[in-house]
Amino acid sequence: MNLPSPAPPTLVLASSSPYRAELLARLGLPFEICAPDIDETPLPQEQPEGLVARLAETKARVVGAKSPNALVIGSDQVAVLGQQILGKPKTHERALQQLRAASGQTVFFYTGLCLVNTLMGEAKTVVEPFQVQFRQLTEQQIDNYLQREQPYQCAGSFRSEGLGIALIQHLQGDDPNALVGLPLIRLTELLEQAGYPVL
């Protein structure tokens, strides 16, 4: 007598970000969305790479606790200018300050990605860096961009997939999707390692 094969795991995106959902949809896999409710405050002396890795895993584990047979994707991103972490500005004034500071400078974006296999209790976490060289921007250009794009929920006040491309002089990194918030190249690798091939 043949035993029934186990049900495949459910793919779950632990995010409220429409941008991440849009990126994940590009892989053509069925998935569910469950927004995590976590404290995203950095720990004392926490470095950017450690912060995004911790938050990505925390998001995936919090959502995974409700799903007994799932592959849960958590992701988090920060932008770093010099020694300062640029989070989501949330207001127009904060976004103005961030983009004034970024004008003519190099900003490093770090995207943490975690895949939790709830059946096995395993988590794999990676951090994908990306470097953005901003053009010298006038006050008028910054204001025009913010009025049109309103990137107040985006790390560093910047959306590369939209009008934000007009702010950029140069990009450097392995996966442009990481800038939007979900590194699909690394995610494909993690899914395949978990026995969930994309192709």
UniProtKB/Swiss-Prot annotation:
Catalytic activity entry: N(7)-methyl-GTP + H2O = N(7)-methyl-GMP + diphosphate + H(+)
Keywords attached to this entry: Cytoplasm, Hydrolase, Nucleotide metabolism
Keyword Acetylation: no
EC number: 3.6.1.-
Species name: Nitrosococcus oceani (strain ATCC 19707 / BCRC 17464 / JCM 30415 / NCIMB 11848 / C-107)
Pfam families in the cross-refs: Maf (PF02545)
Cystine bridges: none
Active site (UniProt): 76
GO-annotated molecular function: nucleoside triphosphate diphosphatase activity
GO cellular component, one term: cytoplasm
This protein's name: 7-methyl-GTP pyrophosphatase
Site keyed Important for substrate specificity: positions: 19, 77, 161
Family according to the record: Belongs to the Maf family. YceF subfamily.
Locations listed in the record: Cytoplasm
BP terms from Gene Ontology: nucleotide metabolic process
Described function: Nucleoside triphosphate pyrophosphatase that hydrolyzes 7-methyl-GTP (m(7)GTP). May have a dual role in cell division arrest and in preventing the incorporation of modified nucleotides into cellular nucleic acids.
Cofactor(s) needed by this chain: a divalent metal cation
Main location group: cytoplasm
The organism's place on the tree of life at top rank: Bacteria
EC category: hydrolase
Record bears the keyword Nucleotidyltransferase: no
